[in-house]
Amino acid sequence: MIHNGMVTYLFDFDGTLVDSTEAVEKALRIAIEKTIPAVIESDLYDDYYKALFLFIKGKLTYQYLGVIHELVAQGTIHEYYKLMPRYIKDFPHARRVIRELRARGRRVISFSGEHTYPGGKVIFMKKTDWYDEFDEVITFRGTKDMLKKFQTLREFYPDEPFVWVDDSPSRFTYILDENTLLVQKASPYKSDVALLFERQNFLKIKSLREILEIDEGLSAFAGGDKT
């Protein structure tokens, strides 16, 4: 049950507000080509690409440690993080929705997983002119840190309804807070979690525009309070 109060919105970034999937693939390829051109036509290219991909996803295995050491030495990883923001694209309506929510007096927080590169998420946000769109930017390292930071937010705003928008519904399975509306943004890269559809405080949307309709519904439910 969502209770009355000023609404706080928590938005994931990659996959929710911006489409970074193609950007990752393009930046990886160009970074390797620019820093280690000798491997482009060799059998090593696939290993270099996979090692770099696993590294930035935080899933590097021992098998690729040697390759990563070379990628660091050649400046490939640095080049990737320099290139990546150029290719990130906003999802339709993303900025308009964020700006409209803030214009309505809502608190809008970026709440997303940190990149493997420390501070990488904030760097990306600043280079894509997203950082200042939010009232606050919070990043977390894994599930335990996510839950800790969510709890800290709840302690700051104990009586206010939260709306958490994310393309990764698996994160929602850890959240038992009944004053948080969990909104899954549909993504071709993420699977549904069947159990969530049984919860009253869960919704799935196709377009970010639907957030504005949800906000209007919450305002009406709260007695027309628009602040």
Task: Give the label of every model feature segment.
Residues 1-46:
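Active-site neighborhood of HAD-like aspartate-dependent phosphohydrolases
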Residues 12-13, 111, 165, 183:
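Short hydrophobic segments within beta-strands
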Residues 37, 47-83, 100:
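A metal-dependent, Asp-based hydrolase signature
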Residues 82-110, 147:
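Short, acidic loop-to-helix structural element flanking the phosphoryl-transfer center
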Residues 109-163, 173-177:
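Substrate-recognition "cap/lid" segment bordering the active-site pocket of phosphatases
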Residues 125-141, 196-215:
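Structural recognition of alpha->loop->beta junctions
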Residues 149-156, 211-224:
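Short amphipathic alpha-helix with an adjacent loop that forms part of the alpha/beta core around
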Residues 163-204:
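Acidic, Mg2+-coordinating phosphoryl-transfer loop and its flanking beta/alpha structural elements
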